[in-house]
Amino acid sequence: MTQSLADMRRDYTRDGLAEAQAPGEPFALFHHWFADAVKTEQLPVEANAMTLATVDADGRPHCRVLLLKALDGRGFTFFTNYESAKGQHIAANPFAAMTFFWPALERQVRIEGRVEKVTAKESDDYYQVRPLGSRLGAWASPQSRVIADREELEGLVKATEARFSDTQPHCPEHWGGYRLLPERIEFWQGRASRLHDRLNYRLVDGQWQRERLAP
């Protein structure tokens, strides 16, 4: 390592986040920030990429990067194999957290809340617009389970391709969407000298309350 970890840092130079810029509820601000990210961030950064954290039945946390695939006034939707590790975690503990980080904008959004499955129709609607290879992969891959090697996975894919050679694959029952229903959303804007802006929204008795947190 050529540089000490203790010396690795960047200075944040963009404008701050004032209460006057923040609406009374968080979804409008998220939509605004997300639109900024779509316009500003460039590959390899994906604007809809986020880290999802779940907790298993033994209380151990796990995190991984996923893609946000739908957003409405109810919450934030992602799709996965329901039998995967994350699916098992959510079945045991339906609370999760997600974090979006947009480095070009020096912004981060943290979201916490309860997770629920979306409807079968919502899952099927999204499944049908995925590329064919991804639709076949949802059938072929025993996600999160141990396999012998890459050849085993490729064999499963070939068998799935043969199975659906004469018909279009339909959405498997073991695959679909989850929606995180937010109870807390924090907007973080990097500022100079690590004196960052943090505006936190909490859902209290069905109403959003906004507050500033110390950096």
From Swiss-Prot:
Query: Which EC class heads this enzyme's classification?
Result: oxidoreductase
List, alphabetically, the InterPro entries matched: Pyridox_Oxase (IPR000659), Pyridox_Oxase_CS (IPR019740), Pyridox_Oxase_N (IPR011576), Pyridoxamine_oxidase_dimer_C (IPR019576), Split_barrel_FMN-bd (IPR012349)
Please verify whether the record's keywords include Flavoprotein.
Answer: yes
A GO biological process held by the record: pyridoxine biosynthetic process
Coiled coil start-end: none
User: Which positions bind substrate?
Assistant: 9-12, 69, 126, 130, 134, 194-196
Pathway, per UniProt? Cofactor metabolism; pyridoxal 5'-phosphate salvage; pyridoxal 5'-phosphate from pyridoxamine 5'-phosphate: step 1/1; Cofactor metabolism; pyridoxal 5'-phosphate salvage; pyridoxal 5'-phosphate from pyridoxine 5'-phosphate: step 1/1
Q: Which domain of life is it from?
A: Bacteria
Reactions the enzyme catalyzes: pyridoxamine 5'-phosphate + O2 + H2O = pyridoxal 5'-phosphate + H2O2 + NH4(+); pyridoxine 5'-phosphate + O2 = pyridoxal 5'-phosphate + H2O2
For whether the record's keyword set contains Flavoprotein, the answer is: yes
Please give the Gene Ontology molecular function terms for this protein.
FMN binding; pyridoxamine phosphate oxidase activity
Quote the record's cofactor note.
Binds 1 FMN per subunit.
Keywords carried by this UniProt record: Flavoprotein, FMN, Oxidoreductase, Pyridoxine biosynthesis
Residue positions binding FMN: 64-69, 79-80, 86, 108, 143-144, 188, 198
Q: What cofactor(s) does the depicted protein rely on?
A: FMN
* Cited PANTHER family: PYRIDOXINE-5'-PHOSPHATE OXIDASE (PTHR10851:SF0), PYRIDOXINE-5-PHOSPHATE OXIDASE (PTHR10851)
Similarity comment: Belongs to the pyridoxamine 5'-phosphate oxidase family.
List the HAMAP family.
PdxH (MF_01629)
Q: What does this protein do?
A: Catalyzes the oxidation of either pyridoxine 5'-phosphate (PNP) or pyridoxamine 5'-phosphate (PMP) into pyridoxal 5'-phosphate (PLP).
Record NCBIfam families: pdxH, PRK05679.1
Its quaternary organisation is: Homodimer.
- This chain belongs to the protein called Pyridoxine/pyridoxamine 5'-phosphate oxidase
Q: Which organism is it from?
A: Pseudomonas entomophila (strain L48)
